[in-house]
Amino acid sequence: NIGLSHARGKWIIFADADDFFTADCFTILNEYMDSPHKVIYFNVRFVMSDDPSQESRRGTYYTNFFNDVNPENKLRYQSQVPWGKMIRRSFLSTFHIQFDETRIANDVYFSCLVGIYAPKVTTDRRIIYYCTESGQSLAMSKQDRESLIIRFNASMKCNRLLRQEKIHYYL
């Protein structure tokens, strides 16, 4: 949220510290600089951090969003991460969309709000981002009870909002 308050560009993109962008990422993003859309969803490749040529097990789940008959809705309502998206900064400001102040899963509700309130979105199947996974990755490591409860509550918060908005894509 501190970073969002300091952002000044037309678009926002996110990255985790251990992930990386493709060589042509910014060429691809540049194609959308004058897009009327509020969010552009891009494909992401999931790889092992110690061997980026090896796909991680999370890859199939996310890639299947793009194989769906209607990938926009899958990505809008079931993608719980901020990366792999190009989000118009003015849209985030207008709807006061920020991250939850939790130690984990702070991006789940953020992504849910973005998906629900963006009036105009599009998808691009090209890969712009590599999400790395290791044995210590938060998403893949064994979670303590408190972490599981935080993740569960974040999902329930999204599900309540989706139901309230009469959107039938539950996490």
Give each language-model segment a name.
Residues I2, I28-Y32, K157-L161:
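A generic secondary-structure signal
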Residues H6, I116-Y117, L161:
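Active-site catalytic microenvironments for nucleophilic, acid-base chemistry
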Residues A17-D124, C131-L148:
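Donor-binding/catalytic cores of nucleotide-activated saccharide
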